């Protein structure tokens, strides 16, 4: 009986973890264009930020801040490919200033926003 209870607990615990991960990802998807950080996510989830930080990292391999920045860079790339100017899009993508946008974009793409736009506009 104790083995059955342990297995049931593990199944429920796993599904609870998956539910939390999906909720975190959904919340980030809906809010990454504003000044979003782990404190906001934890507050929204009514969970301890250390817990969600460990859970998210163990389930996705990424920290929440990396996930948010990757999503922001993905949006920035799409806007640049659509012909928008880098100076005009950083705020739309959730960055508070151009310097941070530039640094994060370059970190994830190995090129500046302008280089990315130039490279991909010739395709």
Please provide the spans of the model-predicted regions.
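Short, Lys/Arg-enriched, Trp-marked, Pro/Gly-tolerant hinge/linker segments that flank
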Residues: 1-26, 30, 39-45, 58-66, ...
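Terminal helix-turn-helix DNA-binding modules in bacterial transcription factors
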Residues: 26, 30, 35, 58-96, ...
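Residues within helix-turn-helix
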Residues: 39, 50, 85-88, 99, ...
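Short hydrophobic/aromatic patch on the recognition helix
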Residues: 51-52, 56, 100-101, 105
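…primarily DNA-binding HTH/wHTH and HhH modules…
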Residues: 103-123
